Amino acid sequence: KYYEPNTVQGRSVIVHLFEWRWKDVADECEQFLSPKGY
């Protein structure tokens, strides 16, 4: 259980991108997560 996940108030999502290449993390954040409000 995550007791202090350091999320924005009212949100509880944590994205697990461990072992991804930095370019792939950037692409995922810019092209998928950010447009969906994460």
UniProtKB/Swiss-Prot annotation:
Subcellular localization(s) per the UniProt record: Secreted
Keywords: Calcium, Carbohydrate metabolism, Chloride, Disulfide bond, Glycosidase, Hydrolase, Metal-binding, Secreted
Record keyword Chaperone present: no
Tissues/organs with expression: Expressed by the venom gland.
Major subcellular site: secreted
Cofactor note: Binds 1 Ca(2+) ion per subunit.
Domain of life: Eukaryota
Listed cofactors: Ca(2+); chloride
Enzymatic reactions: Endohydrolysis of (1->4)-alpha-D-glucosidic linkages in polysaccharides containing three or more (1->4)-alpha-linked D-glucose units
UniProt GO cellular component terms: extracellular region
Enzyme class (EC, first level): hydrolase
Catalytic activity, EC: 3.2.1.1
Signal peptide start-end: none
Molecular function terms from GO: alpha-amylase activity; metal ion binding
Family, similarity comment: Belongs to the glycosyl hydrolase 13 family.
Subunit description: Monomer.
Protein's UniProt name: Alpha-amylase
Organism listed in the record: Tityus serrulatus
Lineage of the species this protein comes from: Eukaryota, Metazoa, Ecdysozoa, Arthropoda, Chelicerata
